[in-house]
């Protein structure tokens, strides 16, 4: 089904561009909004986003634009791919225009000042809008290169989920639905922290046993925290949980993994982020997650360890020693064992 009105993608980064291309390839007119007029002109002229997706041709049906008000007026369905630090400031001035719109967040981050997820910010800005999130093991370049990929659209609004499935589902991109918006979105935000740890481990030459341990203990930490916050633990066994965690912690294409790898090579955090040239949400998420875990009393040793390295002056060897000497806990402690007695 082709949408009668154009579809908006807000954000000129790598994943926003990949989603814009998918929509256009499925026969939809797309308005991709970005702040930078030079970036918009480069895409318009060269049909490529050289800064974020170099070498990927942009479909002719993707129109790069810089007028946000006009874009919101023209489009009913909007995919929001703005950095977590910018989402509120960009959209709040246009709150009235968002009423009744279908807003689907693509951003895997947490607002530092409030610990709100992106869909919660959208809900706060535009309470009359219909809100969803899209999350999963979706590396932007692989999506753009048509690697076989699956994702999850999550909302309690079934019609919104069906609309998103209809416009995005294609021969290489499969869209599943979930009603656990909070769990799907939280999983996407939390895993970025562990990708930094995984990148560091690889740069330091740690073995496959270590990488496997990190991923599985990361899943335990994520799920423990998510259950404390009210999410469904089963969500973390799906694409938006363990699926996203595996790809982000295993692939050099992952931005957060790249930051961790650079740190493992001896670069400072500032230099690692500068070398990346894009937003790595995991760095910001780490700060707020460490504070929140302490506040609510959730045991997250990997989060605490990475925070100690990046912000408290601890060395990696010191943190490893503390982690390995800590009292062993149960392996899977977020599922009730009452049925096994």
Curated annotation (Swiss-Prot):
NCBIfam families: PRK00094.1-2, PRK00094.1-4, PRK00094.2-4. It comes from the Bacteria. PANTHER family: GLYCEROL-3-PHOSPHATE DEHYDROGENASE, GLYCEROL-3-PHOSPHATE DEHYDROGENASE [NAD(+)] 2, CHLOROPLASTIC. It comes from Pseudomonas fluorescens (strain SBW25). NADPH binds at residues 14-15, 35, 108, 140, 255, 279, 281. Catalyzes the reduction of the glycolytic intermediate dihydroxyacetone phosphate (DHAP) to sn-glycerol 3-phosphate (G3P), the key precursor for phospholipid synthesis. This is Glycerol-3-phosphate dehydrogenase [NAD(P)+]. The gene is gpsA. GO terms for molecular function: glycerol-3-phosphate dehydrogenase [NAD(P)+] activity; NAD binding.
């Amino acid at each position: 089904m082709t949408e009668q009105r154009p579809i908006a993608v807000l954000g000129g980064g790598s994943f926003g561009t990949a989603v814009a291309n998918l929509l256009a390839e499925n026969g939809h007119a797309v308005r991709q909004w970005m702040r930078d007029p030079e970036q918009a002109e480069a895409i318009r002229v060269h049909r490529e986003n050289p800064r974020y997706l170099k070498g990927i041709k942009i479909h002719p049906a993707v129109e790069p634009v810089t007028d946000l008000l006009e874009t919101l007026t023209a489009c009913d369905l909007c995919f929001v791919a703005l950095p977590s630090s910018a989402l509120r400031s960009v959209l709040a001035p246009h709150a009235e225009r968002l009423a009744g719109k279908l807003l689907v967040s693509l951003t895997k981050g947490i607002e530092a000042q409030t610990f709100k997820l992106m869909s919660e910010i959208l809900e706060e800005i535009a309470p009359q809008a219909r809100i969803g999130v899209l999350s999963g093991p979706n590396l932007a370049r692989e999506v753009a290169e048509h690697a076989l990929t699956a994702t999850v659209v999550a909302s309690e609004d079934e019609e919104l989920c069906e609309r998103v499935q209809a416009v995005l589902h294609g021969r290489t991109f499969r869209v599943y639905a979930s009603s656990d918006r909070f769990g799907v979105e939280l999983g996407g935000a939390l895993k970025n922290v562990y990708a930094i740890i995984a990148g560091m481990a690889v740069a330091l030459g740690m073995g496959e046993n270590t990488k496997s341990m990190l991923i599985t203990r990361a899943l335990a930490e994520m799920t423990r925290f998510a259950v404390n916050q009210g999410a469904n633990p089963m969500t973390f066994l799906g694409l938006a949980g363990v699926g996203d965690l595996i790809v982000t912690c295993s692939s050099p294409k992952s931005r957060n993994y790249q930051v961790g790898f650079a740190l493992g090579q001896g670069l400072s955090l500032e230099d690692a982020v500068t070398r990346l040239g894009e937003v790595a949400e995991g760095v910001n998420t780490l700060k707020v997650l460490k504070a929140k875990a302490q506040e609510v009393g959730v045991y997250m040793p990997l989060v605490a360890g990475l925070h100690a390295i990046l912000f408290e002056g601890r060395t990696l060897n010191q943190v490893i020693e503390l982690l390995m000497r800590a009292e062993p806990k149960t392996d899977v402690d977020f599922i009730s064992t009452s049925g096994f007695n």
